[in-house]
């Protein structure tokens, strides 16, 4: 083993490496639990410092630094300094010797047949002609790359250049780091890169800032727009603007950092949303009174796919011991032959649906992590062999392909979410919840989540559109030199849009699930109030006859209570004594059936059940509405007779997060607050 001139371990042959093609390392990266991996990402995101060494940058660290209000500081490894210096000196020395190198003594791309000895001037011209982006005017022009994406790109480009194969001074990397740490962000154009010879156009604006180009602008820590001089002053960069030496301009712009930087932040969110979708599916099972059998480990073991197995295991863990599942089991045992044997696909096949999407997102994450730790410019400076190697690592195909695949996975997750909320708001499918999850007293003046479902349809449609690939829209560029190109940043931008839409859907669905949880709580208390009232009225009216003797109708009480168990509360609770609703119809039916079997006793006023029906119904009308209202008020006041079952479930932390930490409230038509206000709280929170 020996250390080469770039400061890295060198090997005379790839074949001496046990994993020369890197397949083993790639496979090893995908072992273990995705959930554990996401937990690690979140821990890394929360770290206060990111130390760059060139080889071990994580997407979570990129996401942390990218945050516009980030307080994360970036440090450069001093150990990398010698390698960076060696490649920079090699370029200067080779030019002094008259060595002909691409981008050092030649023109660029299709015009590389041109030659010059003015190395510094050539780099300045490179930056000038690449400053071809359009920003427009006004804050709403929408043609500026988000500051978070620019910060991600700056971090990733530093990491690449630290590896010492690019021929750039360490001081320039320190200057970019100073801008990051001072929260000074150069303005880059949103569009104009095909991520083929890297992200040439947007990265040229970072180079323009470093060289003090008069058109360079940045956003300062307070959000104001500043020029390059003010940016350098705020960042505390000494010695003024840089005079680019040979190769340095090319080193700055000829890389995939913008596409891979944005892809990193996108995938950080996508991984978390993927885990959240697994948890949400389990909560969906709880509020829908589903059958947890769909998570049985044998089913998924026999299918073999790791994403599916893990998704099912997460759902099984959440549902194990769930109070909702215990209650649902009892309900399924009532008249089992009259109920569906299985739940619909949106619940029953959710592990099979989500598993492959998680595998795709995980694979894309590893691909992008390899990219942000790669050397991706051209030419590469190999000091150990005293040569510049001309290749094409700037081609951002891993970004374009990974982002296209991720976007398709995100769209599939969103589609499942839409299918689930469509069941949840539909009283034909939701096992007794009110239509539109209306929580108010009068369903004629409360349409609950109707607007939310319409919005979800819009989100889902746009998400499905975005699922279409970007990478099959390649145009030959740069005089047919860049005749195939990755479109990496374009695909990353579209995936960022898709993630944003999935966040909208997730926020809406989380509030809907919490609404359903609280409606189940209300349902239980209503049912208990109805049972108690019917039982008490039965005892008063049906137990004895006119003469005080025991009456045959006393045997009806048990059957009357069974009616309440079988009837969905929200089908009648807004007017429980209405004959248009099923409760009174079914209660009367019980009494009529007993009367019909009462035989000769019906002829006697003292023993006639028919003659008891009117008295029973009148007393019920007098008592039941009051008891139902009292039950509602007690739930609203937090003094309900029956506690909310969610507190006995493993999904409770998610409910508590939405209700208590974020403050999203139970929605009713009686309140002024709109659903969107509550969705917004969750959207900002996640």
Curated annotation (Swiss-Prot):
- Expressing tissues: Mostly expressed in stems and bulbs, and, to a lower extent, in roots, leaves and flowers.
Q: Where is the active site?
A: 102 (proton donor/acceptor)
The record's subcellular location field reads: Cytoplasm
2,3-didehydroalanine (Ser) modification, residue list:
197
Q: What is its main location?
A: cytoplasm
Q: Name one GO molecular function term.
A: phenylalanine ammonia-lyase activity
One Pfam match: Lyase_aromatic
InterPro entries (UniProt xref): Aromatic_Lyase (IPR001106), Fumarase/histidase_N (IPR024083), L-Aspartase-like (IPR008948), Phe/His_NH3-lyase_AS (IPR022313), Phe_NH3-lyase (IPR005922), Phe_NH3-lyase_shielding_dom_sf (IPR023144)
> What is a single cellular component term in the Gene Ontology annotation?
cytoplasm
5-imidazolinone (Ala-Gly) cross-link, renumbered residues:
196-198
Task: Kindly tell me the pathway this chain contributes to.
Answer: Alkaloid biosynthesis; Phenylpropanoid metabolism; trans-cinnamate biosynthesis; trans-cinnamate from L-phenylalanine: step 1/1
| Post-translational modification summary for this protein | Contains an active site 4-methylidene-imidazol-5-one (MIO), which is formed autocatalytically by cyclization and dehydration of residues Ala-Ser-Gly.
* Binding-site positions, (E)-cinnamate: 254, 342, 348, 378, 450, 478, 481
UniProt entry keywords in alphabetical sequence = Alkaloid metabolism, Cytoplasm, Lyase, Phenylalanine catabolism, Phenylpropanoid metabolism
Q: Which reaction does it catalyse?
A: L-phenylalanine = (E)-cinnamate + NH4(+)
EC number(s) from the headed UniProt entry: 4.3.1.24
Would you kindly state one Gene Ontology biological process term found in this protein's UniProt entry? alkaloid metabolic process
Highest taxon of the lineage: Eukaryota
PROSITE patterns to which the protein is assigned, alphabetical: PAL_HISTIDASE (PS00488)
- Subunit structure, per the record? Homotetramer.
Q: What is its biological role? A: This is a key enzyme of plant metabolism catalyzing the first reaction in the biosynthesis from L-phenylalanine of a wide variety of natural products based on the phenylpropane skeleton.
| Family label | Belongs to the PAL/histidase family.
> What protein name does the entry list?
Phenylalanine ammonia-lyase 2
């Amino acid at each position: 083993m020996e250390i080469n001139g770039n400061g890295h371990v060198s090997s005379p042959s790839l074949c001496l490496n046990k994993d020369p093609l890197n397949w083993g390392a790639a496979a090893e990266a995908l072992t273990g639990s995705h959930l554990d991996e996401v937990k690690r990402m979140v821990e890394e995101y929360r770290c206060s410092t990111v130390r760059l060494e060139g080889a071990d940058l994580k997407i979570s660290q990129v996401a942390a630094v990218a945050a516009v209000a980030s307080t994360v500081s970036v440090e450069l490894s001093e150990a990398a300094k010698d390698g960076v210096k060696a490649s920079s000196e090699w370029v200067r020395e080779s030019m002094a010797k008259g060595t002909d190198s691409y981008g050092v003594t030649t023109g660029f791309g299709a015009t590389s047949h041109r030659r010059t000895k003015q190395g510094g001037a050539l780099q300045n011209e490179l930056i000038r002609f690449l400053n071809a982006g359009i920003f427009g005017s006004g804050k709403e022009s929408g043609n500026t790359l988000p500051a978070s994406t620019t910060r991600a790109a700056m971090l990733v480009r530093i990491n690449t250049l630290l590896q010492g194969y690019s021929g750039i001074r360490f001081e320039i990397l320190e200057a970019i780091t100073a801008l990051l740490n001072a929260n000074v962000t150069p303005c880059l154009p949103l569009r104009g890169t095909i991520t083929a010879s890297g992200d040439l156009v947007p990265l040229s604006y970072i180079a323009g800032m470093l060289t003090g180009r008069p058109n360079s602008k940045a956003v300062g820590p307070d959000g104001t727009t500043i020029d390059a001089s003010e940016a350098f002053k705020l960042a505390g960069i000494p010695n003024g603007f840089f005079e680019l030496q040979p190769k340095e301009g090319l080193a700055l712009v000829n890389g995939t950092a913008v596409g891979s930087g944005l892809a990193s932040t996108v995938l950080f969110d996508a991984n978390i949303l993927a885990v959240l979708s697994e948890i949400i599916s389990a909560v969906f099972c709880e509020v829908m009174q589903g059958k947890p059998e769909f998570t049985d480990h044998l089913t998924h073991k026999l299918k073999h796919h790791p994403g599916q197995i893990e998704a099912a295991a997460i759902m099984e863990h959440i549902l194990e011991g769930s109070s909702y599942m215990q209650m649902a089991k009892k309900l399924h045992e009532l008249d089992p032959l009259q109920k569906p044997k299985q739940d619909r696909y949106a619940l029953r096949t959710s592990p099979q649906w989500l598993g492959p999407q998680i595998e795709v997102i995980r694979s894309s994450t590893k691909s992008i992590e390899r990219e942000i730790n790669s050397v991706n410019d051209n030419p590469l400076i190999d000091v150990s062999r005293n040569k510049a190697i001309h290749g094409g690592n700037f081609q951002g195909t891993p970004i374009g392909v990974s982002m296209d695949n991720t976007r398709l996975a995100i769209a599939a997750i969103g589609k499942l979410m839409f299918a689930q909320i469509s069941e949840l708001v539909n009283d034909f499918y939701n096992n007794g919840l009110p239509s539109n999850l209306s929580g108010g007293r009068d369903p004629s003046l409360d349409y609950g989540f109707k607007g939310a479902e319409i919005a979800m349809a819009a989100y889902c449609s746009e998400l499905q559109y975005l699922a279409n690939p970007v990478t099959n829209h390649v145009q030959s560029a740069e005089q047919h030199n860049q005749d195939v190109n990755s479109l990496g940043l374009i695909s990353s931008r579209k995936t960022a849009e898709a993630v944003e839409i999935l966040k909208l859907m997730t926020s809406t669905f989380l509030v809907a699930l919490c609404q359903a949880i609280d409606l189940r709580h209300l349902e239980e208390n209503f049912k208990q109030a109805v049972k108690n009232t019917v039982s008490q009225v039965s005892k008063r009216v049906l137990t004895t006859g006119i003469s005080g003797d025991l009456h045959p109708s006393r045997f009806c009480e048990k059957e009357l209570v069974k009616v309440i168990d079988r009837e969905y509360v929200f089908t009648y609770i807004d007017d429980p004594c209405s004959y248009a609703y099923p409760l009174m119809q079914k209660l009367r039916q019980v009494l009529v059936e007993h009367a019909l079997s009462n035989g000769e006793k019906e002829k006697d006023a003292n023993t006639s059940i028919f003659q008891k029906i009117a008295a029973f119904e009148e007393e019920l009308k007098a008592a039941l509405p009051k008891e139902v209202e009292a039950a509602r008020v007690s739930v609203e006041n937090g003094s309900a007779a029956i506690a909310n079952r969610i507190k006995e479930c493993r999904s409770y932390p998610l409910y508590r997060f939405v209700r208590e930490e974020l403050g999203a409230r139970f929605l009713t038509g009686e309140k002024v607050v709109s659903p969107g206000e509550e969705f917004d709280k969750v959207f900002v929170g996640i």
